[in-house]
Swiss-Prot record:
The keyword Transferase applies. This is Bifunctional glutamine synthetase adenylyltransferase/adenylyl-removing enzyme. It comes from Vibrio vulnificus (strain CMCP6). Its cofactor is Mg(2+). Belongs to the GlnE family.
């Protein structure tokens, strides 16, 4: 064994330090020669021996042994038993690990062992350290909290499942260890002053075990412990019972978890009778009874993901993850295990080399191909171990430093780096050729853009990767926030029971969704809204399939959610509406104004009239469907704001009619009908709409302000089996109407209904006789109630009642009034409202309540109607502000320029409120917005109500 000249100075320095320490005096010459050789190659060996005098003294004796793995557990157990606290135990563990790793590295660098011997020692050492640390900590925890037991009082162990290379007995030199913790049965501890649940006991035990192995101390650490392969990953419980574990893998187990579980092995399994139960439980999840060709596509996607990560991180010369590297050999073996392992017991091996032998025996690959794979695997794994043993670092990337390159080449038996590099390339080329033949390369089938969206979903556990894709590949401004949203969404989904079918659909759907979302410049708004909706429907696979199978529906979903949080929330709350997205032509084409009543009757006709609950749900669904179509047309610019309000108002009127009809049937079935209706048409009942519904100005979230009227005389009774007073009948009818509107079903409420504008307000009769209504309006109503009457119209009722209401309204509005008194009362009421509702945000203009806003315009219109209708009776005709101003012009009351300014201000501010409603924003704007319009409104107010102070 000799070193090339560039490495000699490094070795000489190490030898000088060793001689000064004096420990070489007791070493045989052959060992000193080996140490000099290794000193030029491994910083780890030199530094560990130099730091540990006991190791330096005992190393000759250790190296004289051909194998030490059989005694690992007994020797470590003895040392841990002598430890009475964690600090001492942690020191023992780290010293034990470092000493044995020096022994293994020495054997590797001197080529005393085969690869199999080296991997076996590394794996046995890790298992011994994990298991004996567990045994030590279990005893300490039992002393502190009692022994965990099941319902029969039997002590319960924690089983530690080693995953990946640890489970397969193929651990590399500086590897992480992937673990899953489980225990057989729930129960509680016994033998301590206070019992705790088994789950709590094992969680604390697991935390201590991880700390004992993973924590960095003065003596270093033992292993980096990775628990992310457990059910639900980092968001899941640290430890799960068998039952919970089984439920998870049956209901939610994903393809990559199947691959990971192939190599799963319980640490110290011969100690546990419970091991067989766990093994039998997991086998059906890993190995399917049928031949499962879906594994190929899944592995191909995983490989594509890894290749993307290699590119992104700039991992050139990576012998594990690069093309033809160790991971591709593992994937080749796993393909056959997953496809045929359910039928071929020989393929259920954990070790890769024995699996490749089984593949050869079963003639699943050509013998020459298997030979290439075996040779490459042994070569690359030995190279990986030596690379890591040089400095005890977890790396699979070949060095770019010339001295390190030479050291690695010498360790592998070469005199030059180039020769090693040539052999590495040849081995990896042969592996990749087999891989492409067998599995193919998804990257050839997928465009770079599509790959980004696949990776966004596949890598949604890695913030760094996701943020890089969003920022570099998709040019997103808010990459950090959006990355967090995607990662949190996937973590939350991991806790849901999706089932294999649901998860498969979701995995197909998500890249398509990302593609649609990030095609929009406002993706930062669309992303959280769409993810929120998907979170709500994730367990309902039919909805996921609808979006997956109908690209048009998916496109419309993203478009609408991006444009409006109101729509996204509605879809999230009532996913039945997703059906409406399938046909864009229908979606953006609302029902004709005069067809709402007919469409609603047809919609309800499919439901039995006596099924009250279904009828109520159907009303709500009809409203939601129509509102969605109106909003979609609104967002698309098909409908101007005035037309949007028309549609929402006509929809509300159709629903009011249907609700009255349903309520009438339900009340009449019980009591019969009032007898005064026998010789006439209709129901003798009316619904008067006030405010927005009265003025044809409904918004998406508007309440219905209504007053109920009837014309039933006194001393009239119903004709049913259970006779009641006629006026009592109408009271029950109104109560039933409000119930149908307000009851919260699975589809929500229909409308919020406000009846406080009735005579005498909340203390008055819920249903008012029309003659009492007339008397109240003439004799008892306040001026503000007459203002409200300006915007009142009958939205449901008999012709007789309609003409009566119109007569009363006209007479009341056209009453002669004293102008100064009217001015004062209107202005005073406005001032009260402004004090109560306006100016809540000093840095914002409240569109409705602040000075110069919508309410000022409405009050102006109402004042002018009340003041001038006595001499200009045509002013009472309309209930909406726009047509009131048109009539004021026509009747010569107001100059056209002023009326047009007020109309423009009114419609502009309404438009802004409406737009902000779609965005779920408050009805306020910056102080510098609409300044000219607001000043014009204030000037008009001063002109018409000049005797009042505002």
């Amino acid at each position: 064994m000799s070193l090339p000249s560039p490495l000699i100075p490094v070795a000489e320095l190490a030898m000088q330090n060793a001689q000064q320490s004096g420990y070489l005096e007791h070493w045989p010459q052959a060992l000193i020669t080996q140490f000099q050789f290794i000193s030029g190659l491994s910083k780890f060996v030199v530094e560990t021996v130099q730091r540990d005098a006991q190791l330096a003294e005992s190393l000759p004796e250790m190296l004289a042994q051909e194998s030490r793995q059989e005694a690992y557990r007994t020797r470590l157990a003895e040392q841990l038993q002598a430890c009475h606290d964690e600090v001492a135990g942690h020191r023992v563990l780290r010293q034990f690990r470092n000493r044995e790793m020096v022994y293994i590295a020495w054997k590797d660098f001197t080529q005393a062992w085969s690869l199999e011997e080296s991997l076996s020692h590394l794996s046995e050492l890790a298992e011994a350290m994990i298991f004996e640390t567990y045994q030590w900590q279990y005893q300490l925890c039992c002393k502190e909290w009692g022994t965990p037991t099941n319902a029969q009082g039997e002590a319960q162990p924690m089983l530690i499942i080693g995953m990946g290379k640890l489970g397969g007995g193929e651990l590399n030199f500086s590897s992480d260890i992937d673990l899953i913790f489980t225990y057989p049965e729930n129960g509680e501890t016994q033998g301590a002053r206070r019992s705790i649940a088994n789950a709590q006991f094992f969680t604390r035990l697991g935390q201590r075990l991880i700390k004992a192995l993973d924590q960095q101390t003065f003596d270093g650490f033992c292993y980096r412990v990775d628990m992310r392969l457990r059910p639900f990953g980092e968001s899941g419980p640290l430890v799960m019972s068998y039952a919970a574990l089984e439920d998870y893998y049956q209901e939610q187990g994903r393809d990559w978890e199947r691959y990971a579980m192939i190599k799963a092995r319980v640490m110290g399994r011969e100690m546990y009778p419970e091991y067989q139960e766990l093994r039998q439980m997991l086998r059906p999840f890993v190995f399917r009874r049928y031949i499962d060709f879906s594994a190929i596509q899944s592995l191909r996607r995983m490989k594509s993901m890894i290749s993307s990560e290699v590119r992104r991180r700039g991992l050139s010369n990576n012998i594990k993850l690069g093309a033809g590297g160790i991971r591709e050999i593992e994937f080749i073996a796993q393909v056959f295990q997953l496809i045929r392992g359910g039928r071929e017991p020989a393929l259920r091996q954990r070790g890769l080399l024995v699996t490749l032998e089984a593949i050869k025996q079963l003639q699943l690959l050509e013998e020459a191909q298997v030979c290439h794979l075996v040779e490459a695997y042994k070569y690359l794994r030995r190279l990986e171990n030596l690379l890591q043993a040089m400095a005890d670092k977890q790396t699979q990337t070949l060095p770019d430093n010339e001295l390190e390159q030479l050291a690695l080449a010498v360790a592998m038996g070469y005199s030059q780096w180039q020769a090693l590099q040539n052999d590495v390339q040849q081995h990896m080329a042969k592996v990749h050729a087999v891989f492409v033949t067998l599995i193919g390369d998804e990257e050839d089938e997928v465009s770079p853009v599509e790959r980004h969206f696949n990776e966004l979903w596949d890598m949604a556990h890695n913030p760094e990767v996701i943020e890089q894709i969003l920022q570099n590949d998709l040019a997103c401004q808010n990459a950090a926030t959006m990355s967090e949203q995607i990662i949190q969404f996937k973590a939350d989904l991991a806790k849901k029971t999706l089932g294999p079918r649901g998860r498969e659909v979701l995995n197909r759907l998500m890249p398509k969704l990302f593609s649609a979302i990030f095609a929009d410049a406002d993706a930062q708004f669309g992303l959280p809204r769409v993810l929120h909706l998907l979170h709500n429907i994730a367990t309902r696979t039919t909805y996921l399939e609808l979006l997956d199978e109908h690209p048009a529906a998916l496109t419309q979903l993203v478009r609408l959610c991006t444009a409006s949080p109101m729509i996204s929330e509605q879809l999230a709350r009532y996913p039945i509406l997703l059906d409406e997205l399938i046909d864009p032509q229908q979606l953006y084409n609302p029902i004709a104004l005069d067809a709402y009543r007919t469409e609603l009757r047809d919609f309800l006709a499919r439901i039995p009239e006596d099924d009250v609950e279904q009828q109520m749900d159907a009303l709500r669904q009809f409203k939601q469907i129509c509102s969605l179509r109106i909003a979609a047309a609104d967002i698309a610019g098909v409908l101007p704001v005035m037309k949007v309000s028309d549609h929402l108002t006509y929809l509300a009127e159709a629903i009011v009619e249907a609700v009255v009809h349903q309520a009438w049937q339900q009340v009449a079935e019980k009591y019969g009908e009032p007898t005064h209706l026998k010789d006439r048409e209709g129901k003798g009942f009316a619904v008067v709409g006030y405010g927005k519904v009265g003025g044809w100005e409904l918004g998406y979230n508007s309440d219905l302000d209504v007053v109920f009227l009837h014309d039933c005389p006194v001393n009239v009774y119903t004709d049913g089996k259970k006779e009641i007073d006629g006026r009592q009948f109408y009271l029950r009818l109104a109560q039933r109407i409000i119930h149908i509107f307000s009851t919260r079903t699975a589809s929500g409420i229909l409308y919020e209904v406000d009846t406080r504008l009735r005579p005498s307000g909340a203390s008055g009769l819920l249903v008012c006789p029309v003659d009492a209504f007339e008397e109240y309006q003439h004799n008892d109503a306040w001026t503000w109630e007459h203002q409200a009457l300006v915007r009142a119209r009958m939205i449901y009722g008999d012709e007789h009642l309609a003409s009566e209401f119109h007569r009363v309204r006209h007479q009341v509005l056209a009453k002669p009034r004293e102008q100064a008194k009217l001015q004062k009362e209107v202005a005073d009421m406005r001032a009260k409202m402004r004090d109560h509702l306006g100016g809540k945000k000093s840095d914002r203009f409240m569109l409705k309540q602040d000075q110069g806003g919508i309410t000022d315009i409405e009050f102006l219109a109402q004042y002018l109607v009340l003041n001038y209708s006595a001499e200009k009776p045509k002013l009472t005709r309309w209930c909406d502000n726009v047509r009131i101003f048109e009539t004021l012009i026509a009747q010569g009351v107001m100059e056209e320029a002023q009326a047009m300014l007020l109309t423009q201000a009114y419609t502009t501010m309404r438009d802004e409120i409406h737009r902000r409603n779609l965005l779920n924003l408050d009805a306020d704007v910056a102080l510098d917005k609409f300044v000219a319009l607001r000043q014009g409104v204030s000037k008009a107010w001063q002109e018409w109500l000049e005797s009042s102070t505002i």
